Amino acid sequence: MSKPVDHIKRPMNAFMVWSRGQRRKMAQENPKMHNSEISKRLGAEWKLLSEAEKRPYIDEAKRLRAQHMKEHPDYKYRPRRKPKNLLKKDRYVFPLPYFGDHDPLKTGLSMSATDSILGASEKARAFFPPTSTPYSLLDPSHFSSTTIQKMTEMPHTLATSTLPYASTLGYQNGAFGGLSCPSQHTHTHPSPTNPGYVVPCNCTAWSASNLQPPVAYILFPGMTKAGIDPYSSAHTTAM
């Protein structure tokens, strides 16, 4: 970067006055030494000098400063600042080497590895509770026609097979008979919004009058249940 023509140099301090001759001497003795290394060595040597050895250079720096103020009375030191575009570049620059197309970070992760990672996330969904992913686990494509048919028959199976005491106690039209909906249409079908669920058609709700709890009896020797309740004959047959 070229300096403007009207640029005024800053007056030298005592170290600059001393190092001006020492730098030239050290550069001649070590021609392959870098300028930054020369500056480091000169700074270390300057700190080792005593106050008496520094005094002539301090006095020379004062004289040069007074002469500079006389020649440039309006001079004001303005440190050189970096342009804003350079500051923005430095803010986002990272000291990482660039390997081009042979970067191991790029070639190390192949497409098959990426596919396996995505597949592992899909396999992990099987271990999640159903409430966390209700729609992904109930995808219609995951169910066969036989599975859907078994799901439609599930309410009737519950009404007949899992409640054996309903038929033996003569409660077909009582508390347990409401499950099978004998007087209504019993067809079921998958829900249109969520095929994983089965929705019954035209099944009436249970009424409070039909919910009759079974009666418990305590029988003593010589007593029978005849004449106690109307269900005695049915219960005797079941026993």
From Swiss-Prot:
Superkingdom per UniProt: Eukaryota
InterPro entries cross-referenced by the UniProt entry: HMG_box_dom, HMG_box_dom_sf, SOX_fam, SRY-related_HMG-box_TF-like
Alphabetized UniProt keyword annotations: Developmental protein, DNA-binding, Nucleus, Repressor, Transcription, Transcription regulation
Residues of the DNA-binding region: 8-76
Tissues in which the UniProt entry reports expression: In the developing embryo, restricted to the hypothalamus, dorsal thalamus, optic tectum, a region of the somatic motornucleus in the midbrain and hindbrain, the vestibular nuclei in the hindbrain, and a discrete ventral domain in the developing spinal cord.
GO terms for cellular component: nucleus
Cell compartment(s), UniProt: Nucleus
Record-level GO BP terms: brain development; negative regulation of DNA-templated transcription; negative regulation of transcription by RNA polymerase II; nervous system development; neuron differentiation; positive regulation of transcription by RNA polymerase II
CDD domains: HMG-box_SoxB
Pfam families noted in UniProt: HMG_box, SOXp
A GO term, aspect molecular function: DNA-binding transcription activator activity, RNA polymerase II-specific
SUPFAM superfamilies named in the record: HMG-box
Bridged cysteine pairs (disulfide): none
Function text: Acts as a negative regulator of transcription. May function as a switch in neuronal development.
Name of this protein: Transcription factor Sox-14
Organism ancestry: Eukaryota, Metazoa, Chordata, Craniata, Vertebrata
